[in-house]
């Protein structure tokens, strides 16, 4: 008898959750076991009615009461304990970790400790605690499969996923669209509005990640992810601006061979690849018509995109705590920008100041990760007044 793969989707109402559920709708291979959401209870209720999960998780009791008034036949859990439970239950085969921000850290670790197949879209798990998460994955024989289009592309380009091929890799090249301001100089961006920063030319994404793409913070975080996912030193990671977002990443091998993964910009492709791995599943995506594209590439200038400069410096110095500071400061500053409390260029300007002024030892456990994160946010709040 055919047994469907049971999946928990952390962050079901976000853009990655949308694409994951779109893949599930197109196939008959997956059973939604649990769904979680932070604020959009109405959308979560609709998804519960459609997919009939056993569990749903919301952040607090008021949202639990609201969800229970909208749906029946689903057990509603609350808070961090609920997230960790639905990430580690014995019945679950796959956990899609798509919560935005450091809130995704604990449930991702819970999934790793339970030996789950983790589809990782939550950048912060690797950005803030990469050394700790990789240890948990190895120790508990879990699987960590990247969902970001760039890292999933690298994953597909590496022909031996047990990492025995890593000495053969000469360079991992991440591509970046460059965002909506890729052709503008910094002095032209003084009056950028949140609406302009969120208007990504290629991808449909949430507001926070759209701003991160425009500042190249998103790519800087992806550099950190690649560092941990593929066990390579910082000098073996490069970034190219590729406006068409067709070539998702490139791997250069020591014999001079280059292997790239290409496709139209559609998150269903990397998500389906991760969900079905080690096999491939059929999903509805637009075919890539090579005759319609002229692919272009250029170097990502560190002076123009200073987020990259900050992160590469942190990695070269093995200052992993500084990456926690960088990430926490960015989250606070992007929120301030979206709420029109600071100007666009201050996102990076203030982050440079904060990352330089705060110094912590590398964390030995996730409690220390959260402590560094908390102190950084408090410091940013004091700087912003």
UniProtKB/Swiss-Prot annotation:
Catalysis: reaction(s): 2-C-methyl-D-erythritol 4-phosphate + NADP(+) = 1-deoxy-D-xylulose 5-phosphate + NADPH + H(+)
Binding-site positions, Mn(2+): 148, 150, 222
Pfam families for this protein: DXP_redisom_C (PF08436), DXP_reductoisom (PF02670), DXPR_C (PF13288)
GN (gene name): dxr
Disulfide bonds: none
GO BP, sorted A to Z: isopentenyl diphosphate biosynthetic process, methylerythritol 4-phosphate pathway involved in terpenoid biosynthetic process
MF-aspect GO terms: 1-deoxy-D-xylulose-5-phosphate reductoisomerase activity; manganese ion binding; NADPH binding
Similarity section: Belongs to the DXR family.
Taxonomic placement: Bacteria, Pseudomonadati, Pseudomonadota, Gammaproteobacteria, Thiotrichales
Entry EC no(s): 1.1.1.267
Residues holding NADPH: 13-16, 40, 122, 124, 206
Signal peptide: none
Positions contributing to 1-deoxy-D-xylulose 5-phosphate binding: 123, 149-150, 177, 200, 213, 218-219, 222
Name of this protein: 1-deoxy-D-xylulose 5-phosphate reductoisomerase
Function of the molecule: Catalyzes the NADPH-dependent rearrangement and reduction of 1-deoxy-D-xylulose-5-phosphate (DXP) to 2-C-methyl-D-erythritol 4-phosphate (MEP).
InterPro entries: DXP_reductoisomerase, DXP_reductoisomerase_C, DXP_reductoisomerase_N, DXPR_C, DXPR_C_sf, NAD(P)-bd_dom_sf
Enzyme class: oxidoreductase
Cofactor(s) named in the record: Mg(2+); Mn(2+)
PANTHER family: 1-DEOXY-D-XYLULOSE 5-PHOSPHATE REDUCTOISOMERASE, 1-DEOXY-D-XYLULOSE 5-PHOSPHATE REDUCTOISOMERASE, CHLOROPLASTIC
Listed pathway(s): Isoprenoid biosynthesis; isopentenyl diphosphate biosynthesis via DXP pathway; isopentenyl diphosphate from 1-deoxy-D-xylulose 5-phosphate: step 1/6
């Amino acid at each position: 008898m055919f047994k469907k793969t049971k999946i928990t989707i952390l962050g079901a109402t976000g853009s990655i959750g949308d694409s994951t559920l779109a893949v599930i709708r197109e196939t008959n291979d997956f059973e939604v076991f649990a769904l979680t959401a932070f604020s959009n209870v109405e959308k979560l209720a609709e998804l519960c009615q459609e997919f009939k999960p056993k569990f749903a998780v919301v952040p607090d009791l008021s949202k639990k009461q609201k969800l229970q008034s909208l749906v029946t036949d689903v057990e509603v859990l609350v808070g961090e304990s609920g997230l960790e439970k639905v990430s580690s239950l014995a019945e679950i085969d796959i956990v899609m970790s798509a919560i935005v921000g450091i809130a995704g850290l604990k449930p991702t670790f819970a999934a790793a400790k339970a030996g789950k197949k983790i589809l990782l879209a939550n950048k912060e798990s690797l950005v803030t605690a990469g050394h700790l998460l990789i240890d948990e994955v190895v120790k508990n024989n879990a699987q960590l499969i990247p969902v970001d289009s760039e890292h999933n592309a690298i994953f597909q380009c590496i022909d031996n996923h047990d990492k025995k091929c890593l000495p053969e890799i000469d360079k991992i090249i991440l591509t970046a669209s460059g965002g909506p301001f890729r052709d503008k100089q910094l002095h032209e961006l003084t009056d950028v509005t949140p609406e302009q920063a969120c208007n990504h030319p290629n991808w449909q994404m949430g507001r926070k990640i759209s701003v991160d793409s425009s500042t190249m913070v998103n790519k800087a975080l992806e550099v950190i992810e690649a560092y941990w996912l593929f066990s390579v030193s910082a000098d073996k990671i490069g970034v190219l601006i590729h406006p068409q977002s067709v070539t998702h990443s490139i791997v250069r091998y020591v014999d001079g061979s280059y292997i790239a993964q290409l496709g139209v910009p559609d998150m269903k492709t990397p998500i389906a690849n991760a969900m079905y791995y080690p096999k491939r599943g059929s999903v509805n995506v637009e075919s890539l018509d090579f005759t319609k594209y002229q692919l272009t590439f250029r170097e990502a200038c560190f002076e123009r995109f200073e987020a990259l400069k900050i992160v590469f410096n942190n990695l070269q110095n093995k200052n992993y705590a500084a990456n926690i500071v960088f990430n926490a400061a960015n989250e606070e500053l992007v929120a301030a920008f979206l709420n029109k409390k600071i100007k666009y260029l201050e996102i990076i300007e203030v982050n440079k100041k904060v990352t330089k002024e705060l110094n912590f030892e590398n964390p030995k456990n996730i409690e220390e990760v959260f402590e560094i994160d908390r102190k950084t946010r408090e410091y940013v709040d004091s700087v912003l007044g």
